């Protein structure tokens, strides 16, 4: 690990949580240089919904490269882009009666967010945007401004103007409908909240702690947008692409976003980001918003193969099947350790297990890694274990991972109890 410590910036993060050198990967497993296998409950922060090195995706990319397929094309027309757009339309958009234009941005999620915010402000002629508590939308200037976590929002490098924050669903508890707060602030001309160009939200706040918005809350927010002529931007970067069992996480709610941002698994494991926008919002002038790496052609090849999964209901049903197992397993963990005051929440194959004891989730994650399981943390104080396995994970592997977590919690709990009863310390 010395070369990384010598040459790589202090900003590195995951390498600190998982301090080994990984050499290869397959399906739901990572392997280090010594050949040790690790079950992956992180999936590249939601980039690897179809697993590591999916055979069908790899074969398509190899064939494309062997045929001297175009790798870099700016936004030129290419056969790879054509095939991707046709598959996206036929497999995702048309079956859902979704009439959207596709804008390719730079290859990361934050590029898509920046484009969406810029477009919304341009179309509406307003500068304000409303975001929500605990939101995470990226770490470039615009996306960071609509991100809630104070850790990222140092005033030295983020412009806090032109963004208003409102409480997300459940922020004050399930009994409080925070969409009423939103409506009241917009109705009151003296609230200090300017009429925004857009409201941006995640249906499930992944980085924010796996906070799940109720369908009725999402519909209420959409109604506010319609009543006040505000654009609704839904960030599907981490929780879309089938993560909840349907391709879009908002489908069950029945809402119709004006703008949708996609990245991570939309590229089949490769860098790709795009914005879906209603046709009447496509008011860009040619070349008004560009990027050297918009439209990654090799990612188009991978993405086309990944989208084929959604030509039938098989993968969605598999996610539903494993979701029930995951939910049941987490509820069993909560019951097995009542003294910890844990709680579980989520949908599909994104779940969070909150461990309120300060620092314990981090200790459990580290213990899991020693036992051969990669799992990351979420929430403002890193108190949530975030379950984000590949959608294609086998049931046996999922259950094995849950077993490792149970062992890890038990070991960490016993260690804390041995240290002067820390389990009863600060929560």
UniProtKB/Swiss-Prot annotation:
The modification N6-(pyridoxal phosphate)lysine is found at residue 264. Pfam families: Aminotran_3. One of its GO terms (biological process) is ectoine biosynthetic process. Its cofactor is pyridoxal 5'-phosphate. Keywords: Aminotransferase, Pyridoxal phosphate, Transferase. PROSITE patterns: AA_TRANSFER_CLASS_3 (PS00600). Pathway: Amine and polyamine biosynthesis; ectoine biosynthesis; L-ectoine from L-aspartate 4-semialdehyde: step 1/3. Its EC number is 2.6.1.76. GO terms for molecular function: diaminobutyrate-2-oxoglutarate transaminase activity; diaminobutyrate-pyruvate transaminase activity; pyridoxal phosphate binding. It is an enzyme of class 2 (transferase). Belongs to the class-III pyridoxal-phosphate-dependent aminotransferase family. This is Diaminobutyrate--2-oxoglutarate transaminase.
